[in-house]
């Protein structure tokens, strides 16, 4: 239980000189003061956990190529820069490095592609038809489920059970809940006649993808019986390099994610514990 029984705790910055805060955190403090109404330079901030970053992403090879020929991924959408935790400024590194590698790889791929405009039009028309069929099916649904309620339920279960601290029994319960939500999703109703400018239809499409991805995250966590980076299991508090020094790969099958593993290359840099405690050694600081 947090402040006033809510999911909040205090973050006290009042001991830091206001000049220092303004220089280093000025924009953040202004936003906080605008929305909350308190000046964090003089009053402790009220904060709560939130998802700031998603570690992982599309699988790519060393040339930023996905498993789909011709589709490259660079920046925060690919997994390759991320480890078990996010390092500060990694977003910038992933964008710069990914773009540096992906651009020439894309040019090289394009040089060797047999150009056929007619074939491209056929593929486009085929995909357009498929997406329209999905939209039409959603629009015609007339069930009694509210997609926004499903979204809230999914968010609460994921926040409660699939953030940093994870227990296997709760992960199993969460996956069962996600399966329930996916079944209830079939009974949602768009309830919006203005389809030209509707936000309900795009949200419904996004929700379907979020439920799929939530299962990937939940089952991926369930499969990893160790603690590593931002993945902590009290039942398995130590890192297990013998069994889990590998990347989790999930493949879409239409009937739930299919998992495999890819070994992590540590020939140049060995994994080390990131230690924030007082009196840490110089090695731990690296």
Task: Please give the residue ranges for each predicted region.
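C-terminal catalytic lobe of FAD-dependent flavoproteins
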Residues: 1-55, 68, 75
């Amino acid at each position: 239980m947090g402040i006033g029984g809510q999911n909040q705790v205090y973050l006290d910055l009042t001991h830091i000189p206001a000049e220092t805060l303004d220089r280093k955190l000025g924009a953040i403090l202004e936003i906080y003061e605008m929305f909350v109404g308190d000046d964090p330079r003089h009053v402790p901030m009220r904060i709560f956990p939130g998802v700031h970053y998603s570690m992982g992403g599309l699988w790519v090879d060393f040339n930023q190529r996905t498993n789909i020929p011709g589709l490259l991924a660079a920046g925060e959408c690919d997994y390759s820069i991320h480890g078990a935790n996010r390092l500060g400024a990694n977003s910038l590194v992933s964008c710069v490095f990914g773009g540096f590698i992906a651009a020439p790889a894309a040019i090289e791929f394009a040089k060797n592609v047999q150009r056929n405009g007619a074939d491209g039009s056929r593929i486009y028309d085929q995909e357009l038809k498929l997406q329209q069929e999905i939209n039409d099916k959603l629009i015609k649904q007339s069930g009694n489920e509210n997609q926004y309620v499903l979204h809230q339920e999914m968010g609460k279960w994921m926040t409660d059970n699939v953030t940093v601290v994870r227990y296997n029994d709760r992960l199993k319960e969460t996956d069962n809940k996600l399966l329930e939500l996916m079944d209830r999703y079939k009974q949602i109703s768009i309830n919006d006649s203005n389809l030209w400018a509707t936000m309900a239809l795009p949200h419904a499409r996004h929700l379907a993808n979020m439920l799929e991805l939530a299962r990937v995250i939940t089952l991926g966590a369930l499969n990893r019986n160790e603690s590593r980076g931002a993945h902590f299991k009290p039942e398995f508090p130590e890192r297990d390099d013998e069994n889990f020094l590998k990347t989790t790969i999930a493949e879409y099958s239409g009937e739930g994610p299919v998992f495999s593993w890819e070994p992590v290359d540590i020939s140049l840099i060995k994994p080390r514990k990131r230690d924030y405690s007082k009196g840490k050694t110089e090695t731990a600081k690296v």
